[in-house]
Amino acid sequence: VGLTMAAKHSRVADVHAVARARHADAVRVRGLFLTGIWGEGTYRFSCSEDLPPAWRAADYFIITAKSTDTEAVCRQFADAIRGQEVVSLQNGIGNEEVIGRFTDRVIGAMIITRFEWRGDAAVHVSVEAAPMRLGRFPSGTDEAVAVNKAMRAAPIDYFGKPATMRADGRVLYDRSRGHRRRLSR
């Protein structure tokens, strides 16, 4: 999920992705190759194993790590995410509560989409079962969820049509591939 979202948003925003070494190296060398229902192309964006100092003032941080890694990710980037907008785009329940211990600006997100690894820095999107959903945790939608507009601006297609997206309350389910990401407008 993380590298795919970073790739799609790199066309409309400045993006840095924090990824495992093999993926970060591959993205730096040849970009991320994406195929499937969201289109085909090679995407180039900033990617490394850690968050460079220049990226610590991002508009949004998107966490797509496995639920079991949420607290470790939050601890690793605690100084960067404190007081910042943090989007939880992860499998599992309870991620928003964990993130909420590190920032009071948590956005829950849900995406029911199948992302398939086709090699290092190569992803195939084969299924989209529902629109992406975003919502302020724990209260639902508010005007600060401008990330919804940023996500809508990313050129994500579903069978040749723009993907749909809704902003609503707390997320109970979503899908991820164990990477940490963030988006900057």
Named regions from a protein language model:
Residues 175-177:
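Oxyanion-binding "anion nests"
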Residues 39-123:
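Rossmann-like NAD(P)(H) cofactor-binding subdomain of soluble oxidoreductases
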Residues 10, 28, 78, 100, ...:
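Class I S-adenosyl-L-methionine
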Residues 56, 90-171, 182:
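Rossmann-fold dinucleotide-binding core
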Residues 185:
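Interdomain hinge/lid region at the active-site interface
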